Amino acid sequence: MKKLYSIVGMWIVSAFCLLSAQSRVYSSVENVHSHNDYLQNVPFYTAYSARCASIEADVFLVDGELYVAHKENEINKARKLRNLYLNPIREQFEMNGGSGYPNGKSFQLLIDLKTDYKETMKVLEQQLLEYRDCFDVKKNPLAVRVVVSGFLPSPEEFSNYADFIFFDGRPRFIYTPEQSLRIPMMSTSFRTLTQWNGLGRMVETDYNMVKAFID
């Protein structure tokens, strides 16, 4: 079943939908997406305690390390992807006996690359491989699914990366059946579909465009 994520703490600027080919068991809390989660007073744990279905971290590669920040000039060397997300996820995963959330539910970690993918993906893949048990949904459907967004490799390059790493799709591409297996969600600018500002009702033509994209 396709679902549209709600975006927490900001205007909706992107439309996210889950493809039916990649059905998962998610939290029952309205499938909320924690956008720019690292800006929370307590990153990861605030969204985790609310049982968000998707948690987002923007990532920069600097001197061979991955840092979580909104802008490059906001990078804090203490705020590494490993510290803020990978280690806490592993801790909770092990406490839950091999599940993202207790009671047989899970979530996705959306990693938005803010630096060129060629070098950033190398380091990201190396780090994720250290936590493979937590993220390999092919071996364990209750593991945490990793989806990479932002500066993405081309669809032809998807197969160069570990098969438990997924990618955020773009409607401008026509994916092969094999590439589509790596695409659990699609994103586009909300403004490409409608100019609705959130006030009043969306006009019917815009509503139909948004609905068609989700469907």
Enumerate the predicted regions with their spans:
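Bacterial Sec-dependent N-terminal signal peptides
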Residues: 1-27
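Phosphate-group recognition and catalysis centered on beta-loop-alpha active-site segments
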Residues: 21-215
